[in-house]
Amino acid sequence: MQQNTSATAQPGSTVDAAEIAKFSKLSAEWWDPKGKMAPLHRINPLRLGYIRDAACRKFERNVRSLNCLGGLRVLDIGCGAGLLCEPLSRLGAQVIGVDPSQSNIAAAKLHADKSHLAIDYRCTTVEEIDPRERFDIVLAMEVVEHVVDVGVFLKRCAAMLKPNGLMVVSTLNRNWKSFALAIVGAEYVLRWLPRGTHEWNKFVTPDELTKYLLDNRLVITEQTGVVYSPFADKWTLSSDMDVNYMVVAEGMV
């Protein structure tokens, strides 16, 4: 598997210091739907619905219930300023959001306070979480393409799942199509994202991600591509996993 060799991390950590600095600069703009985080705001309803539906199937909940995730302990790794944490909390989940950027966590706490939501935000890394903690759901959304060692990162994520828990991972495939659309198109032509947001050699193919998850005794239950329609100006689920995709995996009992 191709690994990025230019990234820098503290010993024992999968966090890339350059990636933290990159996203820390955007902390003040996370909640602006028309700002530099606009692409995340556009895709967020789709991500939320996919996670909610997968969780309701797994834990036999009524997806129509306003409290459908009630009582479930959810860990959102690389939560940024809480774009996913807040709607998950509104669905009843006990949400723990972690991010290594102090400015991101500060922005998340401020927005949650204004929204009167009790979310446990922590400025920390996945390696620093108490190894005795366990979660019903672990989320790694648009994170694995920013870490130093994907295998080590996912091993730690899997270790925090409760028996038969649920993990959802979203990331970018590594091929010429993803380079053309996710980097050249999104960062240079359309300018949806600041230049340098992504490094193509850190993208992860579905086969690579599958192997990482299977190596950690996780069973993949579903996967889907995510595509953008410029005519409808919205994201939809698709069988096309060439660029953006999501994977759901379950821990073995």
Curated annotation (Swiss-Prot):
Pfam families: Methyltransf_23. Pathway: Cofactor biosynthesis; ubiquinone biosynthesis. Belongs to the methyltransferase superfamily. UbiG/COQ3 family. It comes from Bradyrhizobium diazoefficiens (strain JCM 10833 / BCRC 13528 / IAM 13628 / NBRC 14792 / USDA 110). O-methyltransferase that catalyzes the 2 O-methylation steps in the ubiquinone biosynthetic pathway. InterPro entries: SAM-dependent_MTases_sf, UbiG_MeTrfase. The lineage of its organism: Bacteria, Pseudomonadati, Pseudomonadota, Alphaproteobacteria, Hyphomicrobiales. It is an enzyme of class 2 (transferase). Keywords: Methyltransferase, S-adenosyl-L-methionine, Transferase, Ubiquinone biosynthesis. S-adenosyl-L-methionine binds at R47, G78, D99, M141. This is Ubiquinone biosynthesis O-methyltransferase. It catalyses: a 3-demethylubiquinol + S-adenosyl-L-methionine = a ubiquinol + S-adenosyl-L-homocysteine + H(+); a 3-(all-trans-polyprenyl)benzene-1,2-diol + S-adenosyl-L-methionine = a 2-methoxy-6-(all-trans-polyprenyl)phenol + S-adenosyl-L-homocysteine + H(+). One of its GO terms (biological process) is methylation. The keyword Transferase applies. Its EC number is 2.1.1.222, 2.1.1.64. One of its GO terms (molecular function) is methyltransferase activity.
